[in-house]
């Protein structure tokens, strides 16, 4: 005879087995939001195109997977940026147009900036204004500027400058000495304002892929 206790344990196991997927789904973020997770600021934005699923992991870890996306930006870091040294490690596996970068904003002036460590099949520098180079953390980076006209920003729809450093030797782990880039930008008249958030971002545009990154 099967005991009641055996049936109870089996029933609990079955409930747990069915509960786990829903618990996982609760941790998946698919709509634009910002917040704090395990001591780190996180930001996820999507224009709603395709399928994009973002997950906050332990400490500074996050993962994101996307399929035929429209446009999205995601990542973990700090609510207030600075000239800190940023460590990152993990995997970045895009199919199409995607970026892995230190990403942030400043105000007064309003600036969106990228220190790009890796990218998919498109180097965005092709459509920007080349300003020079900086050598940092084992590679040469090409410096670019680009003006965004009437585009979304942390201050609403606005016209603002983008500053870019694009690494010539791609990587998915290492240390980014942000001060080297900020100083190089300033030497070309590319000045930052008061820092808003600063993250290690995975960004995709009309592409598919996955990324799992830990920030510290």
Swiss-Prot record:
Keywords, ordered alphabetically = Carbohydrate metabolism, Glycosidase, Hydrolase, Polysaccharide degradation, Secreted, Signal, Virulence, Xylan degradation
Q: EC annotation?
A: 3.2.1.8
Which GO MF terms are attached to this record? endo-1,4-beta-xylanase activity
Q: Which PROSITE patterns does the annotation name?
A: GH11_1 (PS00776), GH11_2 (PS00777), GH11_3 (PS51761)
Look at the named UniProt entry and state the broad enzyme category this protein falls under.
hydrolase
GO cellular-component term (any): extracellular region
List the signal peptide residues.
1-19
**What is its subcellular localisation?**
Secreted
Please name the Pfam families in this protein's record: Glyco_hydro_11
Which InterPro entries does the UniProt record give?
A: ConA-like_dom_sf (IPR013320), GH11/12 (IPR013319), GH11_AS_1 (IPR018208), GH11_AS_2 (IPR033119), GH11_dom (IPR033123), Glyco_hydro_11 (IPR001137)
Q: What is its main location?
A: secreted
Residue intervals of the GH11 domain:
28-216
The entry assigns this protein to a family as follows: Belongs to the glycosyl hydrolase 11 (cellulase G) family.
Function of the protein: Endo-1,4-beta-xylanase involved in the hydrolysis of xylan, a major structural heterogeneous polysaccharide found in plant biomass representing the second most abundant polysaccharide in the biosphere, after cellulose. Acts as a pathogen-associated molecular pattern (PAMP) that can trigger plant cell death. Triggers a series of immune responses in citrus fruit and enhanced the resistance of citrus and other fruit against fungal pathogens.
Protein name per the record: Ethylene-inducing xylanase
């Amino acid at each position: 005879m099967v005991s009641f206790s055996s049936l109870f344990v089996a029933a609990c196991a079955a409930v747990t087995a069915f509960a786990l997927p829903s618990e996982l789904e609760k941790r998946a973020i698919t709509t634009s939001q910002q917040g704090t997770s395990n001591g780190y600021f996180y930001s996820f934005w999507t224009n709603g195109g395709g399928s994009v699923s973002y997950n906050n992991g332990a400490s500074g870890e996050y993962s994101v997977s996307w399929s035929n996306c429209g446009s999205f930006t995601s990542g973990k870091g700090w609510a207030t940026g600075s000239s800190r040294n940023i460590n990152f490690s993990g995997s970045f596996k895009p199919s199409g147009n995607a970026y892995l970068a230190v990403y942030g904003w400043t105000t007064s002036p309003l600036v969106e900036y990228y220190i790009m460590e890796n990218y998919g099949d498109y180097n965005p520098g092709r459509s920007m204004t080349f300003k020079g180079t900086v050598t940092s953390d084992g590679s040469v980076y090409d410096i670019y500027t680009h003006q965004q006209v009437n585009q979304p920003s942390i201050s609403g729809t606005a016209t603002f400058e983008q500053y870019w450093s694009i690494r010539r030797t791609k990587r998915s782990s290492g240390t980014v000495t942000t001060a080297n880039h900020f100083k190089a930008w300033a030497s070309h008249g590319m000045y930052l304002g008061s820092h808003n958030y600063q993250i290690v971002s995975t960004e995709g545009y009309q592409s598919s892929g996955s990324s799992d990154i830990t920030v510290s």
